[in-house]
């Protein structure tokens, strides 16, 4: 027996509670890029560009024009996803959560927290939006399977850092539709897609932090924090992953590699770069 329901009435968490010990949750994601490409026709690179803009909701694949795809995504976001969240949780101030979604969509992959978001509302929009309300609204969006949260993990300290989290959209097309397809940021969108792909493959995904000591311009010893895009775990397997849309400059290579160089263990280190070249290992053993 398979049990499903509208987000406005019946979330997966409700199913788990209702059928505790008598069933398992099966999470259905939008199409991965591999699934998307397997059913669409045409050039691989064109399909990738299309996926980055319009995402992998199954209905999108069958639509022909860009206008049809954009209209469909805008409509389903406003009249299904967001409406379900508002109705289920009896949200009175619709403007608040609407703007919150815009803020999260504009900053996918950027570390943030309710306090920072509240300050943004106060300074830029002159709106009072409490930390608790923001936190609750973010949870509602995650429960509705619209966004996902990634915790930050101190790799050397082997502990979670509770301050800032990263938020990603479960489908890049929905994210782009919410912003009216204005902010086409390939680096951040690609990072979002990689995050979703890792979840689809069953991995536990965190954001990594590496603490190092370096010297500032005056030669003083200072503590610095380097970021690893993803710390990926499954059983006894672990991977450290960096995502780079373009890594042609030496500065960008140094930025991506430096975090991996400072990880004091031998788990596999991977750099995912935009393009369809075969994987290879550099002199440091990083898979690119």
Q: Where in this protein do the model-derived segments appear?
A:
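A cross-kingdom feature that marks ATP-driven nucleic-acid transaction machinery
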Residues: 133-288
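Conserved nucleotide-sensing/catalytic segment adjacent to the nucleotide-binding pocket
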Residues: 1-2
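Short, locally clustered residues in the helix-turn-helix/winged-helix DNA-binding domain
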Residues: 102-106, 122, 199
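Interdomain motor-coupling "hinge/lid" segment immediately C-terminal to the ATP-binding subdomain
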Residues: 6-8, 12-111
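Short acidic, hydrophobic short linear motifs in intrinsically disordered regions
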Residues: 109-121
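Hydrophobic (often cysteine-bearing) scaffold residues that line and stabilize catalytic clefts
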Residues: 69, 73, 93, 130, ...
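Short hinge/gating elements
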Residues: 83-87, 119-124, 174-184
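Short, positively charged loop/turn segments that connect secondary-structure elements
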Residues: 122-133
């Amino acid at each position: 027996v398979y049990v499903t329901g509208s987000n406005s009435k019946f979330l997966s968490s409700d199913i788990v509670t209702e059928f505790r010990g008598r069933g398992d949750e099966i999470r259905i994601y939008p199409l991965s890029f591999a699934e998307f490409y397997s059913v669409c026709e045409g050039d691989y690179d064109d399909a990738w560009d299309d996926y980055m803009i319009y995402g992998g909701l199954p209905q999108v694949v069958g639509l022909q024009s860009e206008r049809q795809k954009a209209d469909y995504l805008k409509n389903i976001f406003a009249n299904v996803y967001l409406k379900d969240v508002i109705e289920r949780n009896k949200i009175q101030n619709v403007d608040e959560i609407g703007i919150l979604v815009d803020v999260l969509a504009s900053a996918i992959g950027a570390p943030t927290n309710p306090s920072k978001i509240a300050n943004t509302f106060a300074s830029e929009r002159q709106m009072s939006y409490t930390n608790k309300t923001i936190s609750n609204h973010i949870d509602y969006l995650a429960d509705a399977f619209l966004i996902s949260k990634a915790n930050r993990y101190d790799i050397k300290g082997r502990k979670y850092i509770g301050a800032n989290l990263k938020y990603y959209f479960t489908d890049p097309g929905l994210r782009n539709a919410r912003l009216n397809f204005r902010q086409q940021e390939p680096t951040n969108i690609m990072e979002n897609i990689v995050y979703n792909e890792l979840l689809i493959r069953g991995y536990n995904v965190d954001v990594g932090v590496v603490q190092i000591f370096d010297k500032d311009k005056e030669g003083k010893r200072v503590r610095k924090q380097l970021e690893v895009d993803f710390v990926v775990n499954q059983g006894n397997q672990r991977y450290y992953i960096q995502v780079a849309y373009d890594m042609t400059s030496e500065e960008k290579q140094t930025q991506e590699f430096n975090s991996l160089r400072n990880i004091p263990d031998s788990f596999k280190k991977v750099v995912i770069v935009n393009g369809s070249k075969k994987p290879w290992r550099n002199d440091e053993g990083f898979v690119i």
